[in-house]
């Protein structure tokens, strides 16, 4: 049976096209982050965007940094911490990672000497360094894979803001640790030998310096609007609008570009609808949609997505959940499998 959907009427005064086509046209983009409040449709948006990018780019990687990891559910395909090809594509890959778990893997792969434990304690004394170093390991791994575009399906807003602060945290922390190399490296090597440990601190500091160089490069790329952008996803409610505004202000402080917003789950009752709840909900949504346009209408591409009567799962459904062609009043989206 074909699915039905109430869809958004065409509002007046779009200063910029209500479409993410601009992201496909910007060939220089390397990093695209998708984020927002929990439950607003970040994963569906990031998956759909990655599919559209795969049609115009040589290779695309979709990464989930949300510990909940919904990519596997969205594509109905199991993904892990290594990049795997998405079924039905030759150039789209996906992986699910947890920065803090990545750091734990790095610790467990080290030796068991007392010196190693001491250096871990020294490093972990820096606030946020555990997740940040996990982030660095992920970035180092991702950069080695040479994808032309990388889409991040991020965790809810608070986690995302912390994630985006990692490059700055790491740059400062690794700079301090690397500075210890010249001052205390020989002495720490001697102590390590006395303790019977086989750790060569010069090798450790070389690894830290190498990691710092990667993070410094990534940090510079994140602040370059030609290479990086962030796409907030929201629903037309007070809390979501408030959190989106807070997110955009934080992104501005981090000097991360943002010029697209996806407003998801919009409900527009048909003219002959007898559903009182639908009409009440529609009125509420219109209030906050209007506020969103007042805040962002002149400078942002605001993409309006309808509330669908079916959940978007599987590659076929994700391909139909387009963010490129603006929805028209009365348009029905059929997410059922092709016969």
Swiss-Prot record:
Any one Gene Ontology molecular-function term assigned to this protein's record: metal ion binding
CDD domains in UniProt: ArsA (cd02035)
Catalytic site: 66
Coiled-coil stretches: none
Protein name: ATPase GET3
Gene3D superfamilies from the UniProt entry: P-loop containing nucleotide triphosphate hydrolases
Cellular component annotations (GO), alphabetically ordered: GET complex
GO BP: tail-anchored membrane protein insertion into ER membrane
InterPro entries: Anion-transp_ATPase-like_dom (IPR025723), ATPase_ArsA/GET3 (IPR016300), ATPase_ArsA/GET3_euk (IPR027542), P-loop_NTPase (IPR027417)
EC number, as in UniProt: 3.6.-.-
Job description of the protein: ATPase required for the post-translational delivery of tail-anchored (TA) proteins to the endoplasmic reticulum. Recognizes and selectively binds the transmembrane domain of TA proteins in the cytosol. This complex then targets to the endoplasmic reticulum by membrane-bound receptors, where the tail-anchored protein is released for insertion. This process is regulated by ATP binding and hydrolysis. ATP binding drives the homodimer towards the closed dimer state, facilitating recognition of newly synthesized TA membrane proteins. ATP hydrolysis is required for insertion.
Family matches, as Pfam families: ArsA_ATPase
Protein source organism: Rhodotorula glutinis
Keyword Transport: yes
Subcellular compartments: Cytoplasm; Endoplasmic reticulum
Subunit structure as annotated in this protein's UniProt entry: Homodimer.
Ligand binding (Zn(2+)): 275, 278
Keywords assigned by UniProt, alphabetized: ATP-binding, Cytoplasm, Endoplasmic reticulum, Hydrolase, Metal-binding, Nucleotide-binding, Transport, Zinc
Binding site for ATP: 37-44, 237, 264
Protein family: Belongs to the arsA ATPase family.
Superkingdom to which the source organism belongs: Eukaryota
């Amino acid at each position: 049976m074909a699915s039905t959907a109430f869809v958004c009427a065409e509002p007046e005064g779009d200063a910029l096209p209500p479409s993410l086509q601009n992201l496909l046209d910007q060939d220089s983009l390397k990093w695209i982050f998708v984020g927002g409040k929990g439950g607003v449709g970040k994963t569906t948006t990031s998956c759909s965007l990655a599919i559209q990018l795969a049609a115009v780019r040589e290779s695309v990687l979709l990464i989930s940094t949300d510990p909940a990891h919904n990519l596997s559910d969205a594509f109905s395909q199991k993904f892990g911490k290594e990049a795997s090809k998405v079924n039905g594509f030759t150039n789209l890959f996906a992986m699910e990672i947890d920065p803090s778990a990545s750091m734990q893997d790095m610790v467990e792969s080290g030796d068991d000497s007392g010196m190693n434990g001491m250096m871990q304690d020294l490093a972990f004394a820096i606030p946020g360094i555990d997740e940040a170093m996990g982030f660095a390991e992920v970035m180092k791994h991702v950069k080695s894979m040479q994808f032309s575009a990388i889409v991040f399906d991020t965790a809810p807003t608070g986690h995302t803001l912390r994630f985006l602060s990692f490059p700055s945290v790491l740059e400062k922390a690794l700079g301090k640790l690397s500075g210890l190399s010249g001052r205390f490296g020989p002495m720490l090597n001697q102590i390590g030998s006395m303790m019977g440990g086989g750790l060569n601190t010069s090798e450790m500091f070389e690894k830290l310096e190498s990691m710092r160089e990667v993070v410094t490069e990534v940090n510079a790329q994140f602040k370059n609007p030609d290479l990086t952008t962030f796409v907030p996803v929201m629903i037309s409610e007070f809390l979501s609008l408030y959190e989106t505004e807070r997110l955009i202000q934080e992104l501005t402080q981090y000097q991360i570009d943002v010029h697209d917003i996806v407003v998801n789950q919009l409900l527009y009752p048909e003219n002959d609808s007898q559903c009182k709840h639908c009409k009440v909900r529609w009125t509420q949504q219109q209030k906050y949609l209007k506020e969103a346009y007042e805040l962002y209408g002149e400078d942002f591409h605001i993409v309006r997505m309808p509330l669908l009567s079916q959940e978007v799962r599987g590659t076929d459904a994700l391909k139909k959940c387009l963010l490129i062609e603006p929805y028209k009043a009365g348009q029905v989206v059929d997410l059922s499998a092709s016969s």
